[in-house]
Design a protein with these regions (language model features):
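A structural signal for short loop-to-beta-strand junctions that line the ligand-binding cleft
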Residues: 1-22, 47-49, 132-140, 211-217
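Short, well-ordered alpha-helical scaffold segment located
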Residues: 23-25, 116, 171-172
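Short helix-initiation/N-cap motifs at beta->coil->alpha
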Residues: 33, 90-104
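Glycine-centered hinge/linker elements that transmit conformational signals in sensory
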Residues: 70-96
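Paired acidic/hydrophobic, glycine-rich loop segments that form the ligand-binding mouth/hinge
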Residues: 108-113
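Extracytoplasmic/periplasmic substrate-recognition and gating elements
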Residues: 123-183, 213, 233, 237
């Protein structure tokens, strides 16, 4: 129950992973330092989101938080690192779509939502068979959940509750994971052969998801999210310093 106004139940989860082109590189380094060094010494830019639209900014924000937590460095240092790769490999004004760059091979790695697996390795994908997946080299893995909700004032609560129960049943969870690449919310399905065959990334992030209840919850309300987005846009447009932008992150993430 949320504020006694509606009821919500998770139906699937996802997390960020690194997809890589097996025809370009053999494996992904096990640390962020290794990934960064590989990018610095090759023609491949850091596998991160590069645009400045609202959706891009939100992806970039989560990437920055994840990299910062994994490497144990400050927000200011993370922002400088992120910006270095954007400026070295991309033109922000005319940036290449990250997924498109990955598909054509100008990027060897792509840091993205695990549910992208279905899109990248589907029957209509030009790169099917050349896509592998690796877990992020993070100490702290972010796990996101997707939920269905019903209004507490609904006149069809019983039917809605039955539907939520159906969506959380084992067979529906298996089909949902197979068809969408979402991670099931039922832990015993992490070893399900059908799910692993359709989504091999589930095995690689199994431990992260199983331990997710012990992780701190990162919650950013709408007002703070807007402030973070505005701060990042100013930083990437060279209108603000990494120190000041990092301070905004620190203040709003407390």
């Amino acid at each position: 129950s949320v504020n006694d106004s509606f009821y919500a139940m998770p139906v699937g989860m996802d997390t960020d992973v690194i997809f890589y082109r097996s025809d370009k590189i053999h494996n992904v380094p096990e640390t962020w330092d290794g990934i960064i060094n590989l990018c610095r010494n090759s023609d491949f830019g850091l596998p991160i989101k590069l645009g400045l639209t609202t959706s891009d900014i939100q992806d970039m924000m989560y990437n920055i938080i994840e990299i910062k937590e994994a490497m144990g460095i400050s927000y200011a240092e993370t922002l400088n690192l992120y910006k270095e790769f954007i400026e070295e490999y991309k033109d922000i004004e005319n940036y290449t779509d990250t997924i498109a760059a990955f598909k054509i091979g100008s990027a060897a790695m792509l840091m993205g939502n695990s549910s992208l697996w279905k899109k990248l390795n589907g029957d209509t994908s030009a790169v099917k068979g050349n896509i592998m997946v690796a877990s992020l080299p993070n100490k702290n893995q972010f796990v996101r959940s997707y939920a269905l909700a019903i209004n507490s004032n609904s006149k069809n609560q019983e039917a809605a509750i039955r539907f939520l129960d159906f969506m959380n049943g084992k067979e529906q969870q298996r089909r949902l994971s197979r068809d969408t690449s979402l991670i099931p919310i039922i832990r015993e399905l992490y070893d399900d052969e059908m799910i692993l065959d359709a989504n091999p990334h589930v095995k690689g992030i199994k431990q992260s998801v199983q331990n997710s209840s012990s992780f701190a919850t990162v919650s950013i309300n709408g007002e703070n999210l807007k402030k973070l987005e505005e701060a990042l846009i100013k930083f990437f447009n060279n209108e603000e310093t990494s120190m000041n932008t990092g301070k905004i992150f620190e203040d709003l993430m407390q």
